[in-house]
Amino acid sequence: MTEQEIRQLIHAQRRFFFTGETIPVRYRMEMLRRLKACILKREKEIELALKKDLGKSTFESYMCETGLVLSEISYMLKHTPSFAKEQRVHTPLAQFHSRSFRKPSPYGVCLIMSPWNYPFLLTIDPLVDAIAAGNTAVIKPSAYSPHTSQVIKELIEECFDPRYVAVVTGGRAENTCLLKEHFDYIFFTGSQNVGREVMKLSLIHISEPTRR
């Protein structure tokens, strides 16, 4: 994907986010159910890709990757309605006629950058949380686990409109192009050296990064 295509993708996601379509809880729940169905449909493909990339057994693939993702989806399906509710908070005396609430709100367009060692779990698990929170997401899986990255790309393309969730594959050139753009939140999992670079570049656009 070229730099121009990446920029157009991010702009398309931002426009989609501003429509407000991702905000209703019922939409988030529907998307989580759709993701779960797509994962279950492609479970064997995911298992095979993890074996090719990392030599993981069927047991390890499920217990350390796919099963944990499915568990996170189940958790979010159960708790997203309560997480999204307004929370009553104390009202200052000067505004005693009023009532005060804290309302959880999504960030907007998120970037998820994942590593090679747990390529399915550390890509899709953050995506589950991004969807549950009402965001859109661009996913950049690792170039060092190519078979798993390809399965993730095919799964996401089958499951979602690219204006909502999209995958950008490739290596350092694509990483650099992505980090030049404005994201509202960046979720990065990887080495400290790369994490520092992500942090530095994200601050140019005042993005809020999470490093892990």
Predicted regions and their residues:
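Short "domain-exit" segments at the C-terminal end of structured domains
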Residues: 208-212
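N-terminal Rossmann-like NAD(P)+-binding subdomain of aldehyde/semialdehyde dehydrogenases
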Residues: 1-101
